[in-house]
Amino acid sequence: MTLMIDENFKKQLAQRRERVEDLFYFENSKEIGRGTYGLVYKAVPKKQNGQFPNKEYALKMIEGQGFSMSACREIALFRELRHPNLICLQRVFLTNEKKVWLLLDYAEHDLWHVIKHHRTAKSKKVPIMVPRNMVKNILFQILSGMHYLHSNWVLHRDLKPANILLMGDGPPDMRGRVKIADLGFSRIYANPLKPMAELDPVVVTFWYRAPELLLGAKHYTKAIDVWAIGCIFAELLTAEPLFFCKEEDIKAQNPYHYDQVKRIFHLLGYPSDADWPDMKKMPDHQRLLSDARNEGTPIQTFPNSLHRYFDKWKINSQSSPYRLLVKLLTVDPTKRVSCEEAMNDIYFRKMERPPRETDDVFNKYPIPYAKKEQQMTVAPDQAQQQHQQQQVQMQQQPQMGQQQMMGQPQMVQPQMGQPPMGGAHPGVVAPDGHPHQMMQQQQHPQQHHMQYQGMHDPMQGGMDEGPQAKMMRMGNVPVGRYAPMPPPYGAPQDYHPQQGPPMVQMMQQPGPSGYYPQRPGQPTGAVPGPGPQGYMNPQMGMQMGMRAPGVPPQGYMPGRGMAPPQMGQQQPGPNQQQQQQWQQQYHR
């Protein structure tokens, strides 16, 4: 029997239905992000009433018409789940044109941009790393939010820095709080009717994908989220992705990725039968061994070299953060620590005051990270021209990356042989202080806003989509290739504070390319990326990134949360009183 809805009732409902355009200003707003299934805009209410408080919101438009099953799942989870470290769904709108809008909390920052800010920041003496106490508070709040999800039988399945938001200057009770966003891939995993891998074979951005997923496990648990948290933790400590590997076009129906598995075992060692008894039962285990034989890589003899990797960051293998990281990155998912167990680790108990899920991770100090509207945009034609020039440069050196992998000396072209400007050694430990204090070490005659190249999360544009879908969504802008070796990352060469960076000279040095797509026909600042946190600034570099010899670059960082300085203006640094406050309070 078919149920019919009375036409008069439908007309009355349409007349009473509130239109998003009548309630919020957002039409002229820049696109600030892209979720798993839609675009996100910054919105403010038009009317001052009690229905919507006068503050900023994130307005997410679900792509397509009507309610897809994925959108329904995301909305259902948002409406049921409430936690201080989860983004809050305020309202759902359904337009007469069958468009679905979600009204969410607005977060000014995300971990992707925070990490990128520290990776690309320059200093003549030491790299400006994320303060250790800030890392500790961020990690605790991520664990708290994920423990709540797991306690309610929900897997996030897409944890990465871009999906971890930080509230900016706003209500004092919300400032600096971590918010986990984008539940588009989340699923309830209690008593599934089918194995999770049959329903969704490809989940989690591959830099943060657990080894059991990469090897084709038919069943997976909350341990995949814990692995992703461990990857984010390592990236906060070093400002580099721990399991970076080159980007390739990955088939949407196959989670296996040989280079990613090899990178994991290169650092963690090839698991023995005692380390992971079930690894030989994984569907793609034999495929891994076959690929290794064909490549001539003795993957089964890889030792654990994680401690050597962190030695250059002065993180001792006996320290509490290292030990917690090892627990989070245990290859056997049955032995991997849970979020609740990680929250009770000695790493957090050593703090003078136990961390809380509502703490301000900025510790009430000025926020040094640029706001979304302060990030400049680049003209599409200029970005395309820069991208084409860099492609030509890359084609002139096709073998340099392979030479480096084989340990052969590289033939550097003369115009690219200049050392990176002010490159600091990555082994220098960053103080636990706020980034503002370390700005005083930079003796800038003037600070100007510069276009710098950073690293691009390879899956900012979505989850393991095919090449045709990616090309269509990115406006036919070709995706850059990554160097075949892991970080450290290079620095822009010959940067002059009066003129900005010169034309990029490409080098096949370690590190990803820093591709920043600019989609023709879209609002400036609109870049594909998951969730309201997926915003990327197209002005932060050309579409193919710089790779120069050396280590994380030093350079511009906006001060005190203010807009980037204009040409000819000097950016104020912290005063002596601020430095003393940080030394006495935040460095303890």
Curated annotation (Swiss-Prot):
Main location: nucleus
Skewed-composition ranges (Low complexity): 382-426, 557-588
E.C. no: 2.7.11.22, 2.7.11.23
Recorded GO MF terms: ATP binding; cyclin-dependent protein serine/threonine kinase activity; protein serine kinase activity; protein serine/threonine kinase activity; RNA polymerase II CTD heptapeptide repeat kinase activity
InterPro entries assigned: CDK, Kinase-like_dom_sf, Prot_kinase_dom, Protein_kinase_ATP_BS, Ser/Thr_kinase_AS
Cofactor: Mg(2+)
Binding, ATP: 32-40, 60
Catalytic residue list: 158 (proton acceptor)
Top-rank lineage group of the source organism: Eukaryota
Gene3D superfamilies hit by this protein: Phosphorylase Kinase, domain 1 (3.30.200.20), Transferase(Phosphotransferase) domain 1 (1.10.510.10)
Residues in Protein kinase domain copies: 26-348
Summary of the function given for this chain in its UniProt record: Component of the Mediator complex, a coactivator involved in regulated gene transcription of nearly all RNA polymerase II-dependent genes. Mediator functions as a bridge to convey information from gene-specific regulatory proteins to the basal RNA polymerase II transcription machinery. Mediator is recruited to promoters by direct interactions with regulatory proteins and serves as a scaffold for the assembly of a functional pre-initiation complex with RNA polymerase II and the general transcription factors.
Record-given protein name: Cyclin-dependent kinase 8
The organism of origin for this protein: Caenorhabditis elegans
Gene (name only): cdk-8
